[in-house]
Design a protein with these regions (language model features):
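C-terminal scaffold of the Radical SAM
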Residues: 1-9, 15-291
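Auxiliary N-terminal substrate/complex-recognition segments of SAM-dependent methyltransferases
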Residues: 4, 33, 296-297, 323
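C-terminal alpha-helix/helix-terminus motif
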Residues: 10, 46, 328-332
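Short amphipathic alpha-helical interaction segments
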Residues: 289-304
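A short, conserved structural fragment
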Residues: 303-313
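Minor-groove-contacting beta-hairpin "wing" of winged helix-turn-helix DNA-binding domains
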Residues: 314-318
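Short, amphipathic alpha-helical interaction segments positioned at domain boundaries
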Residues: 320-335
């Protein structure tokens, strides 16, 4: 990252940086010098009053030296891509680490002085049973991370997993099993003191992800790097995904990006698909009157069906609604 890129994207330096999230790929594979340069460049260009600086890491990249260096740079939160505590399932998704390394990474991070740790988990692997998933949750709880994000395994087009699915080499987990696993996730973590504050995110009291919460609450953000997105309430922009093209543009003093103007309907839909993911739901008083009325009309059937609830001018998903959140949000959208 170069200071020129930041200055070109936001030349007036009028924003104050509240959170920094270094992710999108695998930033822990960068050298310590590269990580230092990224963080120091942000601090040099923008006024920073950062409450949270997060770096994504793979467990096998974690060392005491790395954690000590990033802590001294101001990093106070690590998001660790554990995915599963099953060595067999880790091999299936071609991860380099094993379960023992994942547990050791959490201990190393804490010993090196960063106490705010989030771990990512996946469920819905081929042939994974409810007992297997419970074992993963139990292993995670033994480590007592401050935050847990959990998602069902996705077969994204263009990936090796998708190719295996298309060639009938694996069978996708059925919806009923995924639903049972999600229910187990909610019940197990809630019983162990974790707050379920967003569809896929759980935390101990006081440890919500500040950066992600800002995104879900329609806060403007700046994105740097190939394929990164930026948003300022009025426009959304995205950098070219091709790394060579992106680097070439930056070295020439240009930004390889496109943008779109956000009209009122699109902004309303954006609020629905982000705020509705949170336990607070959509604050209807944030909406213009015509959109507030539209939301209430559109929500009636799902309120009657027990998928949504209306309380204190907030429209939010019920527990039943969490299982079909995409459908419920689609019912509320304009575009």
């Amino acid at each position: 990252m170069r200071s020129g890129e930041l200055k070109a994207l936001y030349p007036d330096h009028e924003c104050t940086i509240d959170t920094v999230y270094i992710g999108g790929g695998t930033p822990s594979t960068l050298s310590i010098d590269d990580l230092s340069r990224i963080i120091n460049t942000i601090k040099a260009v923008f006024p920073c009053k950062t409450r949270e600086i997060t770096i994504e890491m793979n467990p096998d990249d974690v060392t005491t030296e790395l954690i000590s260096v990033v802590r001294n740079l101001g990093v106070n939160r690590i998001s660790l891509g554990v995915q599963t505590f099953s060595d067999e399932r880790l091999r299936f998704i071609r991860r380099r680490h094993n379960a023992a390394q994942a547990a050791k990474a959490v201990e190393t991070i804490r010993r090196a002085g960063i106490d705010n740790i989030s771990i990512d988990l996946m469920f819905g692997f081929p042939h994974e049973t409810l007992n297997d998933w419970q074992n993963d949750l139990d292993a995670a709880l033994k480590l007592r991370p401050n935050h847990i994000s959990a998602y069902s395994l996705m077969y994204e087009e263009g990936t090796p997993l998708y190719l295996m699915l298309q060639n009938d080499k694996v069978q996708q987990t059925d919806d009923d099993t995924c639903l049972a696993m999600y229910t187990m996730l909610m019940d197990t973590l809630s019983a162990n003191g974790y707050e379920h504050y967003e569809i896929s995110n759980f935390c101990l009291p006081g440890y919500r992800a500040i950066h992600n919460s800002s995104y879900w609450n329609d806060t403007p953000y700046l994105g740097f790097g190939a394929a990164a997105h930026s948003y300022n309430l009025l426009t959304r922009s995205w950098n070219v995904a091709d790394i060579k093209e992106y680097v070439s543009a930056i070295e020439s003093g240009n930004l390889a990006s496109e943008s779109e103007r956000i009209d009122d309907d699109t902004h309303y839909d954006d609020i629905i698909t982000t705020a509705m993911r949170t336990c607070e739901g959509v604050d209807l008083m944030r909406l213009k009157p015509e959109y507030r009325n539209y939301a209430l009309r559109s929500a009636k059937n799902d309120i009657d069906g027990g998928l949504l609830e209306l309380a204190d001018n907030h429209l939010r998903l019920t527990r039943k609604g969490l299982f079909v959140s995409d459908m419920v949000m689609s019912n509320l959208m304009k575009v």
